[in-house]
């Protein structure tokens, strides 16, 4: 079932019915209490928009090696430059998630894409380190596109299929690889300005035009779901989930450790390989960095599919256990080949882990998917900033990267403990629920394998 326009509610025999506005023939009526049937058109357009948003977000990771060459920036300066994008993405993710819950994904995603066009066209005039710092910060909005799309897609799919649908949507992580490869190819092959810092700036309006076209496609070819479970809720009721108990923060931390691998590595790996292992700048941007993003992206649908079918916490504990080992191997810095093995192994595992964590959000918090997704995405993006800065400080103060990667290994140890012990996942949490309504933070005392078990627990109350 597809919808080409927004819907409006009416009352029929005491039930809330949604009638599609603007339809010329065959008006569509939808029982607001029914399970959503899925919407492939919204899924795939959201996937494309998310991919483009992440491509814009990943631009400065690809530019970093060239900026070192053209402007003689230090490795620390470039690491900070690459880190401000995930920092700003973290800052805007929470409000964007709340706005998506309140106003719908179609409107918010369109406005997000339009907001990206402004700094992209202004990129033609950036000069000096601080102007690039401001530009990179504003382009960080692209990193928040996950939050909006995640809430929009999940509202169209039943809980039994949300893991798979959100895993497919999350393939948009590959946008970082698209951005890094596209930027490098445009600079080295199309614009041919590897030794000149003027012509390469055309990459900004090229991405700006693509983003503007995507905004138009999103507005005219997607619609908001009439099945949303939080209709009529105020912003205060939506954000109350942040006070609902420890569960929301545990889920957020797990996303910090899983999705944070992508934001951390995408920001730091090109510069790290260039500085520590003397990798070629073009190779670092066109091969090493995009490949790690591809590794994250390709395992997300598989992780979502497995999370639909097996106990999610057991699955996550095994993933994080292996990630701890690989993070320690990476901290040892034995050789370039060993580092690449650890990097790509972590990328594959973190993609599956992130999909499993995302699956938990609509199961535990069906009425505040946007708000909780925003918090989780903010944590994942903040991890990219925090760990990249930690790596830069480690290099500056200690002369190497070992301490920074050791800190990262400890983050994975904490995630492994949380999922193995299931601490905090056995107690119900109801503070976020408005008066007179059923609880949203679903408690399942020993098994969170499927949404059906979660719904059964809720019904039993």
Regions found by a protein language model. Give the residues of each.
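Cytoplasmic helix-loop-helix junction between adjacent transmembrane helices
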Residues: 135-172
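C-terminal transmembrane helical hairpin of 12-TM major facilitator-type secondary transporters
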Residues: 311-357
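Extracytoplasmic gate region of multi-pass secondary transporters
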Residues: 60-61, 246-297
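C-terminal membrane-cytosol helix-exit motif in multi-pass small-molecule transporters
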Residues: 188, 208-229, 415-423
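Conserved MFS/SLC helix-loop-helix module at the cytosolic interface between two early adjacent transmembrane helices
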Residues: 91-129
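Juxtamembrane intracellular "pre-TM" segments in multi-pass secondary transporters
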Residues: 26-36, 225-251, 440-441
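Glycine-rich segments within core transmembrane alpha-helices of 12-TM secondary carriers
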Residues: 163-187, 377-387
């Amino acid at each position: 079932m597809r919808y080409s326009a927004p819907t409006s509610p009416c009352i029929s025999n005491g039930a809330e019915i949604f009638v599609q506005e603007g339809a010329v023939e065959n008006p569509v009526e939808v029982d607001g209490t029914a399970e959503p049937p899925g919407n492939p058109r919204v899924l795939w357009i959201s996937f494309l928009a998310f991919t483009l948003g992440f491509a814009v977000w990943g631009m400065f990771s690809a530019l970093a090696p060239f900026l070192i060459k053209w402007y003689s920036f230090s490795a620390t300066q470039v690491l900070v430059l690459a880190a401000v994008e995930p920092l700003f993405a973290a800052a805007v993710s929470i409000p964007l998630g709340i706005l998506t819950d309140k106003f719908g994904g179609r409107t918010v995603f369109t406005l997000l894409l339009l907001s990206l066009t402004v700094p992209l066209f202004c990129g033609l005039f950036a000069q000096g380190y601080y102007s690039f710092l401001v530009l990179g910060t504003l382009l960080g909005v692209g990193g928040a596109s996950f939050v909006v799309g995640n809430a929009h897609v999940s509202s169209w799919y039943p809980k039994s299929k949300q893991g798979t649908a959100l895993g497919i949507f999350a393939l948009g992580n590959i946008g970082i690889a698209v951005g890094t490869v596209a930027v490098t190819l445009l600079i080295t092959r199309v614009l041919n300005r590897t030794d000149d810092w003027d012509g390469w700036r055309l990459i900004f309006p090229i991405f700006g035009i693509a983003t503007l076209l995507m905004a138009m496609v999103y507005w005219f070819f997607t619609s908001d779901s009439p099945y949303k479970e939080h209709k009529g809720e105020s912003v205060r009721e939506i954000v109350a989930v942040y006070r609902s108990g420890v569960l929301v923060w545990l889920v957020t931390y797990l996303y910090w450790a899983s999705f944070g691998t992508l934001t951390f590595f995408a920001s730091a790996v090109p510069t790290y390989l260039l500085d520590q292992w003397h990798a070629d700048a073009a190779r670092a941007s066109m091969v090493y960095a995009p490949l790690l993003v591809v590794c994250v992206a390709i395992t997300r649908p598989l992780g979502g599919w497995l999370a639909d079918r097996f106990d999610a916490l057991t699955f996550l504990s095994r993933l994080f256990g292996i990630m701890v080992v690989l993070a320690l191997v990476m901290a040892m810095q034995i050789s370039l080949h060993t580092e690449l093995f650890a990097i790509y192994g972590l990328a594959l595992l973190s993609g599956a882990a992130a999909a499993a964590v995302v699956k938990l959000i609509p199961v535990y918090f069906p009425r505040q998917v946007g708000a909780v997704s925003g918090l989780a995405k903010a944590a994942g993006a903040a991890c990219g900033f925090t760990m990249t800065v930690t790596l830069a400080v480690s290099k500056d103060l200690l002369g190497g990267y070992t301490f920074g990667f050791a800190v990262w290994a400890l983050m994975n140890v904490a995630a492994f403990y949380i999922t193995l012990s299931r601490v905090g996942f056995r107690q119900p949490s109801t503070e976020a629920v408005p008066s007179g309504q059923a609880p949203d933070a679903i408690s399942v005392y020993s098994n969170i394998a499927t949404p059906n078990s979660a719904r059964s627990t809720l019904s039993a109350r």
